[in-house]
């Protein structure tokens, strides 16, 4: 079957509930991202059941919003917007963008920019004035996505993460 002339269908949405199919697709996309070095903290994919439980848990936490991206109706990436804890009244104006990834097989279609744009729209609709995020310095494509949307780097941590016994630089943005 030829894909010549195929126009990829892309979409991004904030979701409250995931179907079992969604959880499976999200787990597969996250695993692919982890294996390509872009796995929001994981260095190696956990067992499938652990990954699936992780995504089930995300939808149970009221202070988390899950944003998913689809390529040809298959989940290909996501991120989360998290609220500060209730006891942190001094920072209630800001939220955190976390667990951002796009599976390697879905890159190059603009999904990363769409995910970040949806995150910004969601944060604004929830009354947040600022989005904070942090990222390993090795995550070049994620950094490009954030900077293209106007996020400004405000800090660097030389000991942000440890990969294969080596410390990895991390960047903080708002």
Predicted regions and their residues:
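C-terminal "cap" of GNAT-fold acetyltransferases
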Residues: 3-9, 95, 129-132, 136-143, ...
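Acetyl-CoA-dependent GNAT
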Residues: 13-105, 116-118, 122, 159
């Amino acid at each position: 079957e030829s894909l010549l002339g195929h126009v990829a269908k892309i979409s991004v949405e904030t979701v409250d509930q995931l179907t079992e199919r969604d959880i499976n697709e999200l787990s597969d996309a996250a695993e692919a991202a982890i294996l390509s070095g872009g796995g929001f903290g994981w260095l190696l994919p956990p067992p499938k059941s652990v990954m699936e439980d992780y995504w089930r848990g995300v939808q149970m936490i009221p202070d988390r919003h899950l944003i998913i991206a689809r390529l040809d109706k298959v989940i290909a990436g996501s991120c989360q917007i998290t609220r500060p804890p209730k006891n942190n009244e001094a920072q209630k104006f800001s939220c955190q963008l976390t667990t951002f990834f796009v599976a390697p097989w879905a890159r190059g279609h603009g999904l990363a920019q769409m995910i970040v744009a949806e995150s910004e729209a969601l944060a604004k609709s929830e009354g947040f004035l600022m989005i904070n995020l942090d990222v390993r310095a090795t995550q070049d494509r994620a950094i490009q996505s954030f900077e293209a949307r106007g996020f400004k780097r405000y800090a660097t941590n030389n000991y942000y993460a440890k990969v294969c016994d080596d410390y990895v630089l991390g960047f903080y943005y708002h």
